[in-house]
């Protein structure tokens, strides 16, 4: 898996204390992106699932894992495997994506389907600078949605 960075004690990337992984590579290139250094798929560094799980295990207080970016769905198979391993440790998984839920759901891409199945909360949609709102929880712009497990399992978006 190619990543830009990790944060082992985030409180801004989902509920509770989180281990956040910033994946490397993003096709969206949203103007005003908070993480433009994650766009280049050749940037960052290569890490194994075992390395990430070991790093995650160093903080016994974390409640969940957040997959951010970059675009996690650009490395969906690796992210799904990591999410499954996190669930095995009793951690919840939040995934941020510049894609809309409907696009991910309808894509027919089995790796995307696998990552959706391992995601407890999906924050979807591209960052839109004109819709930036600092008052929003866990989102940068008002077009983005926070979709919970029920919405994902029902295959229809419901604001969480």
Regions found by a protein language model. Give the residues of each.
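Domain-level signature for proteins that mediate thiol-based redox and metal-cofactor handling
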Residues: 8-12, 50, 132, 138-139
């Amino acid at each position: 898996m190619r990543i830009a960075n990790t944060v082992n004690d985030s409180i801004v990337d989902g509920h509770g204390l989180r281990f956040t992984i910033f994946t490397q590579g993003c096709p969206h290139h949203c103007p005003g992106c908070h993480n433009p250094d994650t766009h280049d798929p050749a940037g960052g560094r290569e890490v194994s699932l075992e390395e990430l799980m070991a790093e995650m295990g160093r903080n016994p207080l974390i409640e969940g894992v957040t997959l951010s970016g970059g675009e996690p769905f650009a490395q969906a198979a690796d992210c799904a495997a990591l999410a499954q391993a996190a669930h095995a440790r009793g951690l919840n998984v939040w995934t941020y994506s510049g894609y809309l839920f409907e696009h991910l759901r309808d894509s027919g891409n089995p790796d995307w389907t696998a990552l959706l199945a391992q995601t407890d909360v999906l924050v979807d949609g591209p960052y839109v600078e004109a819709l930036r709102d600092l008052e929003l929880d866990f989102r940068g712009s008002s077009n983005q949605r926070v979709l919970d497990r029920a919405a994902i399992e029902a295959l229809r978006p419901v604001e969480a």
